[in-house]
Amino acid sequence: MKQYLDLVQSILDQGAWQENRTGVRTLSLPGAALRFDLQQGFPAVTTKKLAFKSAIGEMVGFLRATRSAAQFRALGCKVWDQNANENEQWLANPYREGPDDLGPVYGVQWRHWPAYKLLPSSAGGQVADALARGYRQVAEVDENGAPHVLLYKAVDQLRQCLDTIRQSPGDRRILFHGWNWAQIEEMALPPCHLLYQFLPNAGTREISLCLYIRSNDVGLGTPFNLTEGAALLHLVGRLTGYKPRWFSYFIGDAHVYENHLPMLREQLAREPYPAPQLVLSDRIPDFAVTGKYEPQWLEQVEPGDFTLSGYQHHAPLTAPMAV
């Protein structure tokens, strides 16, 4: 995957040293972008062995709104163990609900975003509209001396994206995100990959994805997040009847940890292999074949439903994760 190596080299050439919360310095480069044509292959790093099963396990956990490191481990992903149980700041957080708890991270926001409306009790039309949209009244409160009603519902952002792809593919607002200011302090780690926008084309029957990541550990996180984003696009395409096409990957703070430099320099010395192909299990219904819309498969997929075909890679390389 030459694009990945080019990004690493750009950070080494143009990045500036910064201190950060982890205590391990980073070479950081503001504003970076990668773009992949998924018809030409899957964006798997080949200059070391990709932890594919772990990355897919994490993605499946997100789709199931997982908030426990134990549940991620059961899916074959151990990357949350340290953040859940070894981060001193999180261990002292009053919102932590015991061992392995992560708080309302990523998938909780994707699938169960807590939405509230505070409306004047006298605004009957507004209240009626909110109730018709699935909100329910949870309290009556006094706000600035006037009676109000508080209404709540959990928003499944990802399901709404799929519904819109099916019903209105020309819509340019088919997106979901995980940055919930009201709950950031309740999370073991605020979301890094935080905004996903789907771009279907009803004429070509192709679907593309733009992913924005506020902060990306290029040594360890980028290969993981590329895998998850591309796999998610393949899955959404399968469930809605579109072929995955362009995957655009934007990074706010692209950085390399100082103790990852030996691993990355070794990768730069290796020649990338051709891109593999992602294969989805026949268990997952293909809307283009069946004509049946089955969005419930968002939470029914298993890690074993995703495999790489023709994946060649160099020897594994490891580096410590900064927490």
UniProtKB/Swiss-Prot annotation:
It catalyses: dUMP + (6R)-5,10-methylene-5,6,7,8-tetrahydrofolate = 7,8-dihydrofolate + dTMP. Transmembrane segments: none annotated. It is found in: Cytoplasm. The keyword Cytoplasm applies. The active site is at residue 192. Its main location: cytoplasm. GO terms for cellular component: cytosol. GO terms for biological process: dTMP biosynthetic process; dTTP biosynthetic process; methylation. (6R)-5,10-methylene-5,6,7,8-tetrahydrofolate binds at residues 217, 322. Keywords: Cytoplasm, Methyltransferase, Nucleotide biosynthesis, Transferase. Disulfide bonds: none annotated. Signal peptide: none annotated. InterPro entries: Thymidate_synth/dCMP_Mease, Thymidate_synth/dCMP_Mease_dom, Thymidate_synth/dCMP_Mease_sf, Thymidylate_synthase, Thymidylate_synthase_AS. DUMP binds at residues 21, 172-173, 214-217, 225, 255-257. It comes from the Bacteria. Pathway: Pyrimidine metabolism; dTTP biosynthesis. Its EC number is 2.1.1.45. The keyword Nuclease does not apply. GO terms for molecular function: thymidylate synthase activity. Belongs to the thymidylate synthase family. Bacterial-type ThyA subfamily. Homodimer. Catalyzes the reductive methylation of 2'-deoxyuridine-5'-monophosphate (dUMP) to 2'-deoxythymidine-5'-monophosphate (dTMP) while utilizing 5,10-methylenetetrahydrofolate (mTHF) as the methyl donor and reductant in the reaction, yielding dihydrofolate (DHF) as a by-product. This enzymatic reaction provides an intracellular de novo source of dTMP, an essential precursor for DNA biosynthesis. This is Thymidylate synthase. The lineage of its organism: Bacteria, Pseudomonadati, Pseudomonadota, Betaproteobacteria, Burkholderiales.
